[in-house]
């Protein structure tokens, strides 16, 4: 039998209704391109969930899906959900480092994380809703220090792969408090 090709009709339908917590983890930029083509049809549903206060934890390159758009190494621009006013761009290389971060909701606490990325985010001006100040590591782009992540309503977005909740009780407590 011939191998079956999968297409848009085979893609999983997304329904965010009834969920209190949504986690989306990192992936390769080339895979996010395919995800963006599918997820964009659910823009209104993601916006409704965000506005209704659903708690999101979005880590690593999955953050690209929530900005306006992102560009891959081949020069193609992919639309994203548009919840936030940033764009992303894949670069040729890999940034791998540990991080020491301070959450804006508990600046006296330290969050430990690990980053493995080949993308940056770009804002018009400063990040209007950072999740962390950076003690050690990189911001949302190629600069060291500054701020990193997104905390807006109940949306937590970070480059840090963690293990974010297991390794950082302050993050776990804050997310549980918001559920």
Segment roles from a protein language model:
Residues 2-58, 63-73:
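Flexible gly/pro-rich beta->alpha loop and the following alpha-helix that scaffold active-site loops
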Residues 4, 23, 57, 82, ...:
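Hydrophobic/aromatic beta-strand patches that form the interior of the parallel beta-sheet core
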Residues 18-19, 52-54, 76-79, 108-111, ...:
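Short coil/turn connectors at secondary-structure junctions
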Residues 29-30, 63-65, 120-122, 164-166:
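Glycine-rich nucleotide phosphate-binding loop and flanking beta-alpha elements
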Residues 33-35, 66-69, 93, 125, ...:
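Short glycine-/acidic-enriched loop or helix-start segments at secondary-structure transitions
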Residues 36-39, 70-74, 97, 129, ...:
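Short, glycine/charged-enriched secondary-structure capping and boundary segments
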Residues 73-148:
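Pocket-forming structural segment of enzyme catalytic cores
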Residues 155-179:
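Acyltransferase
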